[in-house]
UniProtKB/Swiss-Prot annotation:
SUPFAM superfamilies assigned to the protein according to its UniProt record, in alphabetical order: C-terminal (heme d1) domain of cytochrome cd1-nitrite reductase
Region forming the signal peptide: 1-30
Protein name: Uncharacterized protein YncE
Classification via Pfam families: YNCE (PF21783)
PANTHER family for the chain: DIHYDRO-HEME D1 DEHYDROGENASE (PTHR47197:SF3), PROTEIN NIRF (PTHR47197)
UniProt keywords, alphabetically: Signal
Keyword Signal applies: yes
Amino acid sequence: MHLRHLFSPRLRGSLLLGSLLVASSFSTLAAEDMLRKAVGKGAYEMAWSQQENALWLATSQSRKLDKGGVVYRLDPVTLEITQAIHNDLKPFGATINAATQTLWFGNTINSAVTAIDAKTGDVKGRLVLDARKRTEEVRPLQPRELVADAATNTIYISGVGKESAIWVVDGETIKLKTTIENTGKMSTGLALDSKAQRLYTTNADGEFITIDTASNKILSRKKLLDDGKEHFFINLSLDTAGHRAFITDSKATEVLVVDTRNGNILAKIAAPASLAVLFNPTRNEAYVTHRQAGQVSVIDAKTYNVVKTFDTPTYPNSLALSADGKTLYVSVKQKSTREQEATQPDDVIRIAL
């Protein structure tokens, strides 16, 4: 989750019929319940490998001083840096194909994607996804979220713009297989149900879109809320067994739970304006970052109650989860602007669940 967003928290007075408004009853945990380590400037998304027993963090480094970026390999227990993989292009989004142990990083500024061998740290290849030159009239699509289908060795990448698309990349050849067009304005959210051959995306038009990965065709698109208000469904995470999608909204103080089979809203969970979301099937919980509030929420996915919050100032950004579902990782950004860069590196937090 690496684009900058403005959040406008506001309370909801009324709800759609059949949906739930869930009051937040939670406990706030102190900093001593977490391990926090400074890593590097420009921290964004993470990827976790059970096989390598490692966590990777994409960092864009300094805007002014560094042309490229660094991917850090971290010890998942101590969060100490065990390897620094320097890149001439800045990495932002991240995912891993667990079958091939290939890391994939979105190079947002350059409209490209880079593949890295998780074991060696060697760059396996790179693909420019939108080669158009940026002008006042032309805005190349920018890679945002990445998901890997281990069964087919296919990488799906959301290309964000006024008219977004999803790139479908062959993980073996690192070549573009096809492009799924017309996914709406700022189509950032991306989640995959490999067994069901379904890909889901969300956008700033307030839509939930279902795609058939066998044909790479859009099957359905549904505007989730028809309340006359602005919504930006910025990220989503799936409970594939329960046919649910947890969806964050950067324009509203609630998290939506949607039935992936029909797009119907199952619940509205009261929470601060949100950014990243990650479902944990082991604990039947969902975790959500609230950038402006400086917190991470833990949602009981059975009751839809917010049961815990972690204070994670300044700006909690992205989430990653260990394969056993017992450890949560959070990337946390310091306050930084184009005029005044942060003087301290960004952090990674390890939370024992």
